[in-house]
Each structure stands twice: as C-alpha cells, then as structure tokens.
C-alpha cells in the first residue's frame, strides 16, 4: 500500500481497456464496401463452408466479416453495414454484416429470430398456408 507522499510523487497507473473491434472506432456500426466475398473453413473440430466478406470500412480499415444466415445476395462492390461480434471458429473474423440493411437482403422464409436476420413479418395469408402444412 503506497503512502500519500508516494502517490503525490507518482500517481496510480490507469487500466487501459483494449477494444475488441478497433476498426469500428468507437461506433456501434460502420458502413463499408465489399472487396471480396468468399467461403472459408472453420477451426479443427468443426467442418463447414462459412460465408465471409472482406470489407473496406469508412474508417479506412479493411476487415473480414461474417455473413450470417442461409444464402445471401452480396458480391464485390456491395455496400454493407458492419457490426462487432466475432465468430469463434473462424480465426481473424471479428465482425458481422447486418442483414436487411443497405445492399444486404434479409434471409428468405425465416420465421423465428427474424430481427437478427432482417426478415419482414409474413403476411396473414402466408401464415395460414404454413399453419395448414404443419397439420
């Protein structure tokens, strides 16, 4: 425990919190342009073809971001909205693309967790048709 005189001579060190998404520069989301859209394979125990995109953000950072959901309409030069959030089994992927914003379409025929995938609510007639199929 330091004395008062020691604290006057040299103050306590501030703990600097390191951000997990530095490319967003203190913003919740950033706009960017896709420079490359491709698939990649996850780390060891998992096996899949994960859809990712290399995005040039307005903050001048070039980041790799994950495209969530089934199917997408992204290609080179698409304007996308990027949020933070890593993908545990993809090394170097620390960002997610927001579905249903800017050039990114929402996921088709999605009924649960729609807000996460940018899908509009189904019409009442469509809902009745899907209910009849379940029975």
UniProtKB/Swiss-Prot annotation:
Name the PANTHER family on file: 30S RIBOSOMAL PROTEIN S12 FAMILY MEMBER
Q: What does this protein do?
A: With S4 and S5 plays an important role in translational accuracy.
Disordered: region residues: 108-135
At the top level of its lineage, which domain of life is listed?
Bacteria
InterPro entries hit by this protein:
NA-bd_OB-fold, Ribosomal_uS12, Ribosomal_uS12_bac
* Biased composition annotated in UniProt, kind: Basic residues: 111-122
Please give the residue positions where the record annotates the modification 3-methylthioaspartic acid: 89
UniProt-recorded Gene Ontology molecular function terms: rRNA binding; structural constituent of ribosome; tRNA binding
GO biological processes: response to antibiotic; translation
Q: Which family does it belong to?
A: Belongs to the universal ribosomal protein uS12 family.
Keyword annotations for this protein, in alphabetical order, are: Antibiotic resistance, Methylation, Ribonucleoprotein, Ribosomal protein, RNA-binding, rRNA-binding, tRNA-binding
Basic and acidic residues bias (residue ranges):
123-135
> Which Gene3D superfamilies would you find in this protein's record?
Nucleic acid-binding proteins
**Subunit description:** Part of the 30S ribosomal subunit. Contacts proteins S8 and S17. May interact with IF1 in the 30S initiation complex.
Q: Which GO terms describe its cellular component?
A: ribosome; small ribosomal subunit
Keyword Nucleotide-binding appears in the UniProt entry: no
Q: What is this protein called?
A: Small ribosomal subunit protein uS12
Q: Name one Pfam family in it.
A: Ribosom_S12_S23
